[in-house]
Curated annotation (Swiss-Prot):
It is found in: Cytoplasm. NCBIfam families: xseA. It comes from the Bacteria. Belongs to the XseA family. Keywords: Cytoplasm, Exonuclease, Hydrolase, Nuclease. Heterooligomer composed of large and small subunits. Bidirectionally degrades single-stranded DNA into large acid-insoluble oligonucleotides, which are then degraded further into small acid-soluble oligonucleotides. This is Exodeoxyribonuclease 7 large subunit. Signal peptide: none annotated.
Length: 444
């Protein structure tokens, strides 16, 4: 068996890193349909899930920056269409998808139709701000085009009754969902214009899925709204729901209730004007951002290939794993420390601090007495030793020797004379006795 003389040897981490780069660079973006399962949404804001079909499954991650743009709440068991890129979670060697966008299955075809019609109508100028009609500051009559049994109608009527109970209201009932809904909505708008009973119209309905709201994305509705001589406020679904009707209408309200607030008179008329301008500005920004989204997406993919955010996302996913392990470890430590505290508390309760204080006081008193006794004994001993030293000193003192009859003789220079060899005839010497001195001259 022959072996390569120079085999390329990998570490596990290096191998996983190169496999990740291979997947991300070679495969690029993929579109995938599957069923959501094992969905988790940790505090980091990222989503982790599994997409599966009847024969296979794949792990997926959708980071916070992307999932905040999802317009619905994903649930286990729900079919979704995702745009993703292949990757590898290096710490575990798990092959996974990094999801960049997500929508409910079936929304993809409708979204394409939506984008195509929106671009077509925008090119014709139907969305232009110059085509918008100003809303009357004090409407004399409000027309409502919606379902006569829907919750949206009752929400609008309740708000109008609360804010301006004397404002006349005319209802033009119509279907707001289904095959014939778009035609009926267009006919209701035409009927309101031909009767010319109102000076403002609210067109809308409550929230729903993309399919539920689709009649407001039909071209016939958009063109009828654009052709209306009466200013129209669109109020379709919730704030996150955006339809073609919203772009064509003179003003978009986020909800039916908000539309009623917008068209009804209020004592604070100046605040109403400011609020209206804010809504128009937001609508213009939304249109602009929507028009630029496709243009940005091409550049976004190129940038993201080398963007540090990719590494940050991987590290963030790893951090989620470490956070989970840390939480488990902290919980175990807390339990052990709690057990120790309970044991220490029990031991502490069996010890009396007062008893220990009393014992320490007694010990201090004993040590104090012993210290004083030791000081007294030491002082007495030092005095005795001092007396003995004084006696010894007195014994060797020259004065004591002189008292016994001895004398001390010195020459003229003061040097001590201890021998006759040290004096000569004629020298002057000084002799000291115990009671004084005598000077003498040496004769011989």
């Amino acid at each position: 068996m022959s072996l390569d003389s120079n085999p390329r040897i990998f570490t596990v981490s290096r191998l996983n890193s190169e496999v990740r780069l291979l997947l991300e660079n070679e495969m690029g973006i993929v579109w995938l349909v599957g069923e959501v399962s094992n969905l988790t949404m940790p505090v980091s804001g990222h989503w982790y899930l599994t997409l599966k079909d009847s024969q296979a499954q794949v792990k997926c991650a959708m980071f916070k920056g992307n999932n905040r743009r999802v317009t619905f709440k994903p649930q286990n068991g729900k079919q979704v269409l995702v745009k993703a890129r292949l990757s590898l979670y290096e710490p575990r060697g798990d092959y996974q998808l990094i999801i960049e966008s997500m929508q409910a299955e079936g929304d993809g075809r409708l979204q394409q139709e939506f984008d195509h019609l929106k671009m077509s109508l925008a090119a014709e100028g139907l969305f232009a701000q110059t085509a918008k009609k100003a809303l009357p500051e004090q409407p004399k009559c409000v027309g409502i085009i919606t379902s006569k049994t829907g919750a949206a109608l009752f929400d609008i009527l309740n708000v109008l009754k609360r804010r301006d109970p004397n404002l006349p209201v005319i209802i033009y009932p119509t279907l707001v969902q289904g095959t014939n809904a778009a035609i009926q909505i267009a006919q209701a708008i035409g009927r309101a214009n031909s009767r010319n009973e109102c000076d403002i119209l609210i067109v809308g309905r409550g929230g729903g899925s993309l399919e539920d709201l689709w009649c407001f994305n039909e071209e016939i509705v958009a063109r009828t709204i654009a052709a209306s001589q009466i200013p129209i406020v669109s109020a379709v679904g919730h704030e996150i729901d955006v339809t073609i009707a919203d772009f064509v209408a003179d003003v978009r309200a986020p909800t039916p209730s908000a539309a009623a607030e917008l068209v009804s008179r209020d004592l604070s008329s100046q605040l109403q004007i400011v609020s209206h301008q804010k809504r128009r500005l937001r609508s213009a920004i939304e249109r602009y951002l929507s028009q630029q989204q496709k243009r940005l997406s091409t550049y976004q993919f190129r940038i993201e290939k080398q963007h540090p955010q990719l590494q940050l996302n991987t590290q963030s996913q790893r951090l989620d794993d470490l956070n989970q392990r840390l939480e488990n470890h902290i919980q175990q430590r807390l339990e052990r420390n709690q057990h120790k505290i309970e044991n220490l508390s029990l031991r502490l309760s069996n010890l009396s601090p007062a008893r220990k204080v009393h014992q320490d006081k007694q010990r201090i008193e004993t040590l104090k007495r012993r210290l004083l006794d030791s000081m007294d004994r030491n002082l007495l001993m030092q005095r005795h030793q001092l007396a003995l030293a004084a006696e010894k000193l007195d014994t060797v003192s020259p004065l004591a020797t002189l008292k016994r009859g001895y004398s001390i003789t010195r020459n003229a220079s003061g040097s001590l004379i201890t021998s006759t060899q040290q004096v000569h005839t004629g020298d002057t010497i000084t002799t000291r006795f115990v009671d004084g001195e005598v000077q003498s001259t040496v004769d011989k």
